[in-house]
């Protein structure tokens, strides 16, 4: 049986190992997963309380249009319900956008080190992928603008960026948007929006009034702590959302997921507390890095990226200590956990870098 030729160049997505899988390799002790940027504190207690009380008719299909959830999102964001599209996580929405917009021969433009699903789905649709290197961990919008051409159908901007945690500020993003043709869709992936504390971070939703070619993505998987429910959403012009709905699978968000997201979206106090604790956790890591001259990218997310050598070696050290982090070819990404979890990882990092310095001194004196 034949499939698309371009699939031969792709691999299925490989998530980080689960605690159960880690036990098979590193021994039967407890593991703390700090590899996938999940909320270590879980979801709002209101969600748990309401789901225990409520009864869902399991034999019936869910609301195919996620009407209640979309209306609550629209009301809070001051847009029309018709401007909101809900999906089974942002992964599905990225797939919907790619399938609806891209044709063979088109191209997309994005960063070289960013969320890989932009590239993945473009290749499936037979498109060229133009990747621009990050500038000190940040999207280089000036360079991206220079490679956009008449065949560029989508520019993907992950802001704040995964895996670096860095962000493009309001001035640079606005200037970039003004210079891009309205024939090119600009998708701004704000999966970590709720964690942002920077005062010059762009407020993108007001830009929809002026620019028809902007689509903003957000999720319930990160700050809201609902990753297992798989709920993400896009906000854009009504005409665009209507076209994307043609591609969207029917009944794509389960009744349970819609219920959980609806409740979670109303608990602002929970999000405020999560952001406060996360900011303190980032400060733990940043203080450690500064005190020990370890490079890091200042983060506006719930993770921190250290562009260091021997990432696999650090991963192994953390794994043996019971912590699952994410290694990359050029560094490590660590999800911010509880204070105690952060202290545990920092202790492992401290030992690793002390051993590295000691080894370097020994080699110099040999």
UniProtKB/Swiss-Prot annotation:
S-S bonds: none
Biased composition (Polar residues): 1-11
Keyword entries, A-Z: Amino-acid biosynthesis, Aminotransferase, Histidine biosynthesis, Pyridoxal phosphate, Transferase
Protein name: Histidinol-phosphate aminotransferase 2
Family matches, as InterPro entries: Aminotrans_II_pyridoxalP_BS (IPR001917), Aminotransferase_I/II_large (IPR004839), HisP_aminotrans (IPR005861), HistidinolP_aminotransfase (IPR050106), PyrdxlP-dep_Trfase (IPR015424), PyrdxlP-dep_Trfase_major (IPR015421), PyrdxlP-dep_Trfase_small (IPR015422)
Family to which this protein belongs: Belongs to the class-II pyridoxal-phosphate-dependent aminotransferase family. Histidinol-phosphate aminotransferase subfamily.
Start and end residues of each stretch annotated as Disordered: 1-21
Superkingdom of origin: Bacteria
Reactions catalysed: L-histidinol phosphate + 2-oxoglutarate = 3-(imidazol-4-yl)-2-oxopropyl phosphate + L-glutamate
Subunit composition and interactions: Homodimer.
Cofactor names: pyridoxal 5'-phosphate
